[in-house]
Amino acid sequence: MNRIDFKFKELKDQGKKALIPFITAGDPSLDTTVNIVLEMDKKGADIVEIGIPYSDPLADGPIIQGSSQRAIKGGAKIRNIMETVRKIRGKSEIPLVYMVYYSSIFKYGLERFIAEASAVGINGIIIPDLPIEERGDIMDITVKYEVHLIPLVAPTSKRRIQEIAAGGSGFVYCVSKNGVTGVGEKIKTDIKEYMELVGSYTELPKALGFGISGSSMAREFKPYCDGIIIGSAIIDIIYKCKGEKEILDKVGNFISEVKKSLE
């Protein structure tokens, strides 16, 4: 069983919700990325999303864009990110998911990317800009290598939600609002209604992300979904810290606090 499937089943049996933090690989460094993931695992994260930095991340707001730019400037590339994941997997069984833009993996080679991701211990892939017409070809490869292709839906038309949610595996990444990632802007979507709509088209677990800033919002939305995804708030903590020790302390405390709100 894929680690993602096992984790959601385990949490469902316990009546708990998944905490899914996002970080950018290589911000502030690849070595620190390893230690951040291990610390988040220790403090209660259930699944970790690892963003592969991209020069023009259309779905991301300024916080994650800045993180991508810092990681690229620091030398983070797909090849050395794969090695970073291998190091994490050598010390942890936590489910790991890549968030990666389509053009990055297209240039690298679709099958090469997915085969290498599977080999180093990645359990799922989210491609925010994946054209629907390309999904079938990629899904054939992800199935071959036992990696989930996680669909990403937004509060748009019912037909579009149905089309996207019906294809994919692992869980559905439910974007809480139209636009880009980031905290500070009020979520205007009726989350209960939106989650019920997505749930009417798929039996996959539903994880809610974009704009969730911490434990109070996680607590507010947890009745309607199976997991909460938090990215920009964590990236912002990392950016404001001086040195790895402070990063690990503050990110670890944040994860502990949010995890408590989901229990």
Swiss-Prot record:
- Keywords linked to the UniProt accession: Amino-acid biosynthesis, Aromatic amino acid biosynthesis, Lyase, Tryptophan biosynthesis
Q: What is its EC number?
A: 4.2.1.20
Q: Quote the pathway field.
A: Amino-acid biosynthesis; L-tryptophan biosynthesis; L-tryptophan from chorismate: step 5/5
MF terms (GO), sorted A to Z: tryptophan synthase activity
Catalytic function, reaction form? (1S,2R)-1-C-(indol-3-yl)glycerol 3-phosphate + L-serine = D-glyceraldehyde 3-phosphate + L-tryptophan + H2O
Q: Which Pfam families match?
A: Trp_syntA
Residues of the active site are: E49, D60
**Catalytic EC class:** lyase
**Classification via Gene3D superfamilies:** Aldolase class I (3.20.20.70)
GO CC, sorted alphabetically, is: cytosol
Q: Which domain of life is it from?
A: Bacteria
Subunit and interaction comment? Tetramer of two alpha and two beta chains.
Q: Which NCBIfam families match?
A: trpA
General function of this protein: The alpha subunit is responsible for the aldol cleavage of indoleglycerol phosphate to indole and glyceraldehyde 3-phosphate.
Task: Name the family.
Answer: Belongs to the TrpA family.
Give the matching PANTHER family: TRYPTOPHAN SYNTHASE ALPHA CHAIN, CHLOROPLASTIC, TRYPTOPHAN SYNTHASE, ALPHA CHAIN
* Protein name according to UniProt: Tryptophan synthase alpha chain
| Source organism (scientific name) | Clostridium kluyveri (strain ATCC 8527 / DSM 555 / NBRC 12016 / NCIMB 10680 / K1)
